[in-house]
C-alpha cells in the first residue's frame, strides 16, 4: 500500500569482518521495494500467540538473520507463531524521513498492513487474534513504537477487508530502539535530568 516507489533492485550481503557480531557475519538486505511477511509456525504446542519481528538496520538495510530468523527460531521453539516482516527500506532520503513518528512511512504502512492481515487470516495460521504482538530491534524497535502509537488510522488507502481489522499490537517489545530522540546534540553520557 501507499503508492509506487521507484529505486534500485533489492540486494543482499554479508557484513565484512569488522562488522561481525559475536565473531560471525550477519545477513542483510537493502533496497527492499516489495514487503513480504514469512510465517513460521510453532515447532511445539501452539500457544495461539504470534509475534511480528521487525529487524533493524537504520531504515537502510534489514538484519534478516541476527534480528530476524534467529528470533523466529527461538519464538517457534516455545510455541509462538513468528512472522518475519521484510518491510520496505528503499534507497533514498525521501523514504527515511516522514510523519507519524517514523523515519520511513513505507515501513509503518507495511507494519499496519501486516497486523491487519494476521488478524484477518488468524484462523488459517492458528493464531489468537487477541494475542498478536510486535518485537523490533534498533530501527525495528523504533517501528514498534510507531505502530504502537499509530494504529487508529491507516496511513494508506485500504486495499481489502484486512484493512478493516485492527492494526494495534496486543503487546510491544522495542529492543534498543533507534531514532527516538529528535535532538541529537545531547551527549549520550550525560544525564539531562
Across the structure, where does each feature detected by a protein language model lie?
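N-terminal targeting or regulatory segments adjacent to alpha/beta-hydrolase or S9 domains
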Residues: 1-30
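Short amphipathic alpha-helix adjacent to the substrate-entry channel of hydrolases
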Residues: 65-84
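Primarily recognizes the serine-hydrolase "nucleophile elbow" in alpha/beta-hydrolase
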Residues: 106-192
Amino acid at each position: 500500500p501507499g503508492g509506487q516507489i521507484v529505486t534500485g533492485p533489492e540486494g543482499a550481503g554479508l557484513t565484512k569482518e569488522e562488522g561481525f557480531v559475536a565473531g560471525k557475519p550477519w545477513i542483510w538486505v537493502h533496497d527492499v521495494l516489495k514487503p513480504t511477511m514469512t510465517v513460521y509456525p510453532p515447532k511445539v504446542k501452539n500457544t495461539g500467540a504470534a509475534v511480528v519481528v521487525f529487524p533493524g538496520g537504520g531504515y537502510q538495510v534489514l538484519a534478516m538473520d541476527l534480528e530476524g530468523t534467529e528470533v523466529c527460531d527461538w519464538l517457534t521453539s516455545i510455541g509462538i507463531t513468528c512472522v518475519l516482516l521484510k518491510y520496505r527500506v528503499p534507497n533514498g532520503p525521501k523514504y527515511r524521513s516522514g510523519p507519524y513518528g517514523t523515519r520511513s512511512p513505507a515501513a509503518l504502512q507495511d507494519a499496519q498492513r501486516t497486523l491487519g492481515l494476521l488478524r484477518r487470516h488468524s484462523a488459517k495460521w492458528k493464531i489468537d487474534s487477541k494475542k498478536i504482538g510486535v518485537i523490533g530491534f534498533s530501527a525495528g524497535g523504533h517501528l514498534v513504537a510507531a505502530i504502537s502509537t499509530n494504529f487508529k488510522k491507516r496511513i494508506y488507502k485500504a486495499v481489502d477487508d484486512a484493512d478493516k481489522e485492527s492494526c494495534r499490537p496486543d503487546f510491544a517489545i522495542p529492543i534498543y530502539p533507534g531514532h527516538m530522540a529528535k535532538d541529537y546534540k545531547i551527549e549520550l553520557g550525560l544525564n539531562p535530568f
